[in-house]
A protein has these predicted regions:
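Segments surrounding the PLD/"HKD" phosphodiesterase catalytic module and close analogs
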Residues: 111-140
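A short, charged
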Residues: 140-150
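A ubiquitous, low-specificity "background" feature that marks scattered single residues
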Residues: 76-78, 121, 143-145
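A surface-exposed partner-binding patch
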Residues: 1-112
Length: 150
């Protein structure tokens, strides 16, 4: 099991301690809808499979300054009580700057992305876009981000 899944269990315990909880997982049909709308609105983008695995565990995360984007609210089958930073709407904002289109934005505190040109996961400084570090896998990037906030 990837390290980030163990760290997510720790975050769940912290949330429960304060009477809160993690978000529900995204369903397969919500992810299919998201993929379809991504193709329409963002072009020929393939959402990284490890990120989809994350969404199937928890539909986004907003914890201690780290935000990981989830399936956009208007694509969800059930209404939710809290705001989700939607993957599509957030990437549309990032893509207003042409140079940022080489990235698939997955979350932020600093910005968690997939670099489609270099085929690596990266952490970019927010707002300058300066590369902070790169990771060979989504699992390594997410584990690093979660370790920082726990």
């Amino acid at each position: 099991m990837p390290k980030w899944k163990y760290l997510l269990i720790e975050i769940k315990k912290i949330e429960e301690k304060y009477g809160s909880s993690l978000r529900n997982p995204a369903s397969d049909s919500e992810i299919i809808k998201m993929n379809h709308i991504v193709q329409q609105k963002l072009g020929n983008i393939i959402i990284p499979e490890p990120y989809i695995e994350f969404l199937k565990k928890v539909n986004g995360l907003d914890f201690n300054g780290l935000v990981m984007y989830g399936v956009d609210e208007d694509l969800l089958e059930k209404e939710i009580d809290e705001e989700i930073h939607g993957f599509i709407e957030t990437n549309e904002l990032w893509y207003e700057n042409d140079w940022q289109k080489q990235y698939i934005f997955l979350g932020d505190s600093d910005t968690a992305c997939y670099d489609t040109k270099e085929k690596v996961y990266v952490e970019l400084d927010k707002p300058s876009g300066t590369l902070i570090q790169s990771f060979k896998s989504f699992d390594a990037m997410l584990s690093n981000a979660l370790e920082t906030i726990i």
